[in-house]
Amino acid sequence: SKQIRPTTKDPKVFYELGQAYYYNKEYVKADSSFSKLIELKPSLYIGYFWRARANAAQDPETKLGIAKPYYEKVIELCSANGEKYEDELIESNEYIGYYYTIHRDKAKADVAWNKILKLDPKNTKALNGLKMK
């Protein structure tokens, strides 16, 4: 399919376009749209969050960790309002925890798992992550 090139500076257009590409499994195009959203609104977490998802979908085994910098930015932008962004913070830290687990850095993985447990003490992914050697 052809890439749509909006001439607008309206971030909402790039958000909606990125979502359309994402749900159509066109992850590279989604990433490009969310990149433009970040360019227009760098202080908003949502562009980084969806860019992280688009990159995670391109690296399903998390071998390359291409979503990591975007999930880290989500954590940075959302941590001050943890209750409001609980779902986003949990998803972001789950990715980070898993990334460090498969890359054999238990100390960094455990930091991510513990951040999740502060928001959701019964989170099974985090509890299981902490049990891993």
Predicted feature locations:
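Residue-level recognition of tetratricopeptide repeat
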Residues: 10, 44, 89, 122-123
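Conserved structural position within tetratricopeptide repeats
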Residues: 2-6, 35-39, 76, 83-84, ...
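Structural motif corresponding to the intra-repeat A-B loop/turn of tetratricopeptide repeats
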Residues: 24, 58-61, 103
